[in-house]
């Protein structure tokens, strides 16, 4: 039952984060890449190749969706695509984090899916606090926050994907080196989670602050053309 709940949460997570062009593809590619790299160095070549094959399947969607080939195409992931990706990610992570000789520690899995997981939990908690359904739509996701701060949808895609890649890299390095104990990595993840939740809770204030910083940077650049 616990595995079933985890699987369902991750599937819904993938569906909820699919809010702007290419975002689900970018975030899922980061998760598959991080998982595949760890599995490859652990000698789990079959599962690693499965992860890399998923990236190869997702990449054309990202390129067409973002117009990277010179023209934008209306390519939609849809509920079927997003739920299939979420199911595949959670299946691989559950397969590789359980048992006595698991190649990936459970806390590393949290870092691998950090951004989608944080976004889903923070949003669902906020909705429940307001007496709303946790699955009711709103405009408080991370991409809404970034676009409210004055960024375009493509810039939001790049920023969120880079943030996800950075967090996943932390997990990969920690898993590969084994220098930092798992309990420390869990505390660090919870601190990152708290910071994310703080920003989401004060989304309007954060957006205004970012706008002010961007305006100051523009004014400074305009006054100093050289």
PLM feature spans:
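Residue-level recognition of specific faces of alpha-helices
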Residues: 13-16, 145
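Alpha-helical transmembrane segments
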Residues: 23-149, 153-222
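RNA/tRNA-interacting regions in translation and RNA-turnover enzymes
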Residues: 16-24
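Single conserved hydrophobic/aromatic residue that forms the stacking wall/gate
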Residues: 1-7, 11
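N-terminal cationic leader/targeting segments used for protein routing and processing
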Residues: 2, 224-225
């Amino acid at each position: 039952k616990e595995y079933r709940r985890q699987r369902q949460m991750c599937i819904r997570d993938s569906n909820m984060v699919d809010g702007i062009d290419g975002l689900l593809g970018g975030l899922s590619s980061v998760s598959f890449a991080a998982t595949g790299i760890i599995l490859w160095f652990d000698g789990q070549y079959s599962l690693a190749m499965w992860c890399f094959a998923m990236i190869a399947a997702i990449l054309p969607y990202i390129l067409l969706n973002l117009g990277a080939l010179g023209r934008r195409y209306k390519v939609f992931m849809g509920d079927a695509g997003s739920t299939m990706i979420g199911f595949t990610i959670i299946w691989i992570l559950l397969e590789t984090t359980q048992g006595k000789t698991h190649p990936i520690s459970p806390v590393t899995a949290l870092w691998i899916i950090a951004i989608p997981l944080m976004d889903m939990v923070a949003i669902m908690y906020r909705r429940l606090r307001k007496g709303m359904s946790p699955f009711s739509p709103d405009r408080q996701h991370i991409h809404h926050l970034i676009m409210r701060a004055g960024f375009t949808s493509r810039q939001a895609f790049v920023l969120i994907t880079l943030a996800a890649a950075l967090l996943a890299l932390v997990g990969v390095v920690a898993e590969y080196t084994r220098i930092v104990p798992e309990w420390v990595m869990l505390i660090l993840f919870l601190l990152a989670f708290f910071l994310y939740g703080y920003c989401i809770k004060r989304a309007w204030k954060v957006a205004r602050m970012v706008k002010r910083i961007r305006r100051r940077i523009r004014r400074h650049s305009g006054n100093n053309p050289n």
